[in-house]
């Protein structure tokens, strides 16, 4: 199973002070050196963390695939066509949300997305849609021309609250959805809310049907804690 490392929250720390550090570009290069298979970043409309220049530099400097998460807006499509990431993942976006709260409703946007995606497909960019593990959404994703889906795994988090039955049921839902999507010619990825605490069981149960995980916040959080001693010693 491949790992896509999301560097958004390196930029979140930087933007808290509107300064130049820490750099998500440096983080992307370190992730690549550490063995990541892909760099994922979300250029939001409000630019709350990743900035346009981050995307441009990461695409220019890393030698592994770049996955651009973006809302289905005209502005973002223009940026994607200019920068040419290896993949775009369409996600829903609300300015008031802290993070992406759920999957894209492809069913209700079906006709619009068919037209929206045409130039991106013609440019040779892989198209992935971030959706719930739902058969209707999978069918719609195939119909609009997606190459892949990324299943929203946020509801798998009850494992961390010791609600094991709920977590097992969510794994079952994700497995069924992944199999259904693969049978219809879609590649299957997954992400959101995966941590060091719950990812091992996820991989063990789904490695035969899910090709790739995209993980960011948990990696950044661990880096802050486990790199803190070294950083303090270097300052002293």
UniProtKB/Swiss-Prot annotation:
Protein name, UniProt field: Pyridoxine 5'-phosphate synthase
Pathway connected to this protein: Cofactor biosynthesis; pyridoxine 5'-phosphate biosynthesis; pyridoxine 5'-phosphate from D-erythrose 4-phosphate: step 5/5
Organism annotation: Aquifex pyrophilus
Principal subcellular localisation of the protein: cytoplasm
UniProt-annotated binding residues for 1-deoxy-D-xylulose 5-phosphate: 8-9, 44, 49, 99
Family classification: Belongs to the PNP synthase family.
Site (Transition state stabilizer): 150
GO cellular component: cytosol
